[in-house]
Amino acid sequence: MDPMSLTLPTPRTPDPMSAPPLRWGVLGPGGIATALVTTLHANTRQRLVAVGSRSQERAEQFAARFGAERAYSSYEQLVADPEVDIIYVATPHSEHLANALLAIGAGKHLLIEKAFTRNAGEARQVRDAEGAA
């Protein structure tokens, strides 16, 4: 059989609207969080339910803008919310380790984008904490 005559199957791309909706919490309501939530709302059935910030005012503004039900003035309050399934960490990368460990300790799933942590050692700490949870 000639390998050039093989027909490859059409790739299947999952429909993002078919994914089960998760209840998201945003930790750090800044520009990158705005981009993520805008994309989630436009392309999926995911729900933003809570926002945590060091500033109650910023949390409330972000929550109002994107329809979140709750706004918290601390990250601890956000991760303690039983109605949040997954935390999007949108703080400066120098804070990612502490934020990730806080969320993992509360039993939450995480999404952390680049830079994941400041270095490989911190990344291993997050991996190890998640593995132990």
Describe these PLM feature segments.
Residues 2-66:
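N-terminal Rossmann-like dinucleotide-binding module
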Residues 40, 103, 130:
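Short hydrophobic alpha-helical segments of the AMP-binding
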Residues 63, 127-130:
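Conserved hydrophobic residues forming the short capping helix/wall of the S-adenosyl-L-methionine
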Residues 69-127:
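Beta-loop-alpha module in the N-terminal Rossmann-like domain of NAD(P)-dependent dehydrogenases
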Residues 107, 132-133:
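Glycine-centered short loops/turns at secondary-structure junctions
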